[in-house]
Amino acid sequence: MAHHKSALKRIKQNKKKYLRNKHIRSTLRTFIKRVREAVEAKNADQARQALLAAIPVIDKAASKGVIHASNASRNVSRLTKLVNTLG
């Protein structure tokens, strides 16, 4: 256990950030999963709607620093490509 006041504060801050990031990552995965499920079901309209809902969530996670900007860009690109296969 930490003895310094600053170390104790850091532990509290890290726990708070961990919980916040965990929630954002979980939400992010859910939105991505919805897009993939709609594509698997070959439901083009639902897939497009899910993609339009997922893109802001992915971008926001990147801007908050939860995921890297390149990771966000890659996710958006791959999901868009996947949805476009439905025509």
From Swiss-Prot:
One of its GO terms (molecular function) is small ribosomal subunit rRNA binding. The keyword Ribosomal protein applies. InterPro entries: Ribosomal_bS20, Ribosomal_bS20_sf. The keyword Translocase does not apply. It comes from the Bacteria. Keywords: Ribonucleoprotein, Ribosomal protein, RNA-binding, rRNA-binding. One of its GO terms (cellular component) is cytosol. One of its GO terms (biological process) is translation. Belongs to the bacterial ribosomal protein bS20 family. PANTHER family: 30S RIBOSOMAL PROTEIN S20, SMALL RIBOSOMAL SUBUNIT PROTEIN BS20C. Binds directly to 16S ribosomal RNA. This is Small ribosomal subunit protein bS20. It comes from Geobacter sulfurreducens (strain ATCC 51573 / DSM 12127 / PCA).
